[in-house]
């Protein structure tokens, strides 16, 4: 029925696929991979990317950055007043309490999503204008430091150090304050357009509750999706909150 006409990207999150088309993002249920089913969709203005973390989808489109509540994936909801205007948002990655947007000539735009329904622009980083054609960014940790790997189009690959013990107090914390600085560059044969996703280590289950690692203790297992949802949803499917 043409629901995927104009498909331009796909983001996998467990047994679900989020596919961007010309005017919306479509959620596919891939629990039976040979019989995919359309679960839901939400409107978007030429979406370019989606990053998934817990109950939220962080989307970039021609309007900029937008937060979508996917607590119920059958009824995704754009969070009102949870958007940030960006001129050329091309891709997005999320790592704990920060989203990293590949923003073309504006370089890397870092957005604070500690409160996902109230995102705030944290910083724009261009290395004094040298990062100016950003197509993609992926964030990963090596040992105890956080790095950003940037596909900067005509400028090739750029590596950012985001945290380190010398510049970032509390860098061992859950989500320390990030302070980007360029530590390496590599000119590529052609424009650098994309960065592959790194390995997710120490991960027990995927976004749909499927076990992805083997535990080293006899009889142990991670919680499944139903068990996890009971920790943050009431019997009526509402999110637990405190006043």
Language model region names:
Residues 1-243:
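Feature marking well-ordered beta-strand scaffolds used for ligand recognition
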């Amino acid at each position: 029925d043409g629901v995927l006409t104009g498909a331009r990207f796909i983001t996998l999150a467990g047994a679900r696929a989020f596919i961007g088309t010309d005017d919306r993002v479509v959620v596919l249920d891939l629990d039976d991979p040979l019989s995919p089913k359309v679960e839901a969709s939400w409107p978007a203005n030429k979406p370019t990317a989606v990053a998934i973390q817990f109950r939220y989808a962080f989307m970039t489109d021609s309007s900029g950055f937008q937060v979508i509540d996917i607590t119920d994936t059958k009824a995704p909801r754009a969070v009102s007043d949870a958007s940030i205007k960006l001129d050329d948002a091309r891709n997005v990655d999320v790592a704990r309490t920060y989203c990293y947007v590949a923003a073309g000539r504006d370089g890397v735009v870092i957005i604070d999503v500690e409160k996902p329904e109230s995102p705030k622009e944290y910083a724009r980083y261009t290395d004094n204008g040298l990062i100016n054609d950003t197509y993609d960014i992926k964030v990963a940790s090596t040992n105890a430091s956080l790095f950003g790997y940037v596909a900067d189009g005509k400028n090739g690959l750029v590596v950012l150090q985001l945290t380190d013990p010398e510049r970032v107090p509390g860098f061992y914390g859950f989500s320390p304050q990030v302070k980007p600085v360029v530590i390496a560059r590599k000119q590529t044969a052609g424009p650098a357009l994309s960065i592959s996703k790194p390995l997710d280590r120490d991960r027990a289950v995927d976004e749909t509750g499927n076990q992805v690692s083997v535990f080293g203790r006899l009889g142990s297992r991670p919680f499944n999706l139903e068990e996890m949802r009971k920790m943050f949803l009431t019997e009526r499917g509402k999110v637990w909150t405190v006043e």
